[in-house]
Amino acid sequence: MAKRLWSVFTDDMDHCYLTGSSVVERHHIFESRQGFKKKSEARGFVIPLRPDLHPNGARFVRSMENLQIDRKLKQMAQTYYEENYGSRDDFRQEFGKSYL
């Protein structure tokens, strides 16, 4: 059985958060060798994105606009974290750096 991913930002994991497209990949907002992917899953920092907007996807189009989207998602997640889970220092401890 596939892992059931969830998001603090949407209940609809089957449509792109930004465009509404039904063709999506699940984006872990924080992902790295330090285990941030699992931490993203635990905190609900996963979001459905169209494949060309998914920073880790094979069809990602590297543009300034798309890189800004990735940065904005990281900022949204950090803001949510600070409002619901812990302080900015706690966030840095868990995810390596601040995006705000």
Regions found by a protein language model. Name each.
Residues 21, 52-55:
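Short Cys/His-rich local motifs and their 1-3 flanking residues in nucleic-acid-associated proteins
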Residues 21-24, 82:
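Charged, amphipathic alpha-helical interaction segments
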